């Protein structure tokens, strides 16, 4: 069992019940899934770029990503219908907790000039979005073997009803919020 999953059951759930006064432990918010998305606009000119992006995301997530394609042609961006424009991967259960553990304890502290993540990136429904500018903050990526620095978007989907509950949940997981 993942270290953070045990931590959630033993520490986070009782603390949230005490903080918000839930009547049942089933009401306590939990992390449902983590989605990693990498938009690769350069893939229009060079198909190899997409292969590198997919392999980077696979190393980071430990799971093969799905290539996302353009839904319609846009002449201004030089993309056609069904052109590959990015890749994404959805993590659930143990893989999700393992990734969150690596993100909080290893990757985020490796960000240059890191002062914490914004506490305002909640969507109003208890989900959290954050961007990572460089994929090299993850220890799985070797600096010498990458072709370009690529960022990715990380979405943490929770069952929380409000942003306040979601922030309390992530804070108890020792998520490094600013201030």
From Swiss-Prot:
Keywords: Ribonucleoprotein, Ribosomal protein, RNA-binding, rRNA-binding, tRNA-binding. Part of the 50S ribosomal subunit; part of the 5S rRNA/L5/L18/L25 subcomplex. Contacts the 5S rRNA and the P site tRNA. Forms a bridge to the 30S subunit in the 70S ribosome. This is one of the proteins that bind and probably mediate the attachment of the 5S RNA into the large ribosomal subunit, where it forms part of the central protuberance. In the 70S ribosome it contacts protein S13 of the 30S subunit (bridge B1b), connecting the 2 subunits; this bridge is implicated in subunit movement. Contacts the P site tRNA; the 5S rRNA and some of its associated proteins might help stabilize positioning of ribosome-bound tRNAs. Belongs to the universal ribosomal protein uL5 family. SUPFAM superfamilies: RL5-like. This is Large ribosomal subunit protein uL5. GO terms for biological process: translation. GO terms for cellular component: cytosolic large ribosomal subunit. The keyword rRNA-binding applies. PANTHER family: 60S RIBOSOMAL PROTEIN L11-RELATED. InterPro entries: Ribosomal_uL5, Ribosomal_uL5_bac-type, Ribosomal_uL5_C, Ribosomal_uL5_CS, Ribosomal_uL5_dom_sf, Ribosomal_uL5_N. GO terms for molecular function: RNA binding; rRNA binding; structural constituent of ribosome; tRNA binding. Pfam families: Ribosomal_L5 (PF00281), Ribosomal_L5_C (PF00673).
């Amino acid at each position: 069992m993942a270290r953070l999953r045990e931590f959630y059951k033993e520490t986070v759930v009782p603390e949230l019940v005490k903080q918000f006064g839930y009547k049942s432990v089933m009401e306590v918010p939990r992390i449902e899934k983590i989605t990693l998305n990498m938009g690769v606009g350069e893939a229009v000119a060079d198909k190899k770029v997409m292969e590198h992006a997919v392999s980077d995301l696979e190393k980071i997530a430990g799971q093969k990503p799905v290539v996302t394609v353009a839904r319609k042609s846009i002449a201004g961006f030089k993309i056609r219908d069904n052109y590959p424009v990015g890749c994404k991967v959805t993590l659930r259960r143990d893989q999700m907790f393992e990734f969150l553990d690596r993100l909080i304890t290893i990757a985020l502290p490796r960000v240059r000039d890191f002062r914490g993540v914004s506490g305002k990136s909640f969507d109003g429904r208890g989900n959290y979005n954050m961007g990572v500018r460089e994929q090299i903050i993850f220890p799985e990526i070797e600096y010498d073997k990458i072709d370009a620095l690529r960022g990715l978007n990380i979405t943490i989907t929770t069952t929380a009803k409000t942003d306040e509950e979601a922030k309390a949940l992530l804070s108890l997981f020792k998520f490094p919020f600013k201030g």
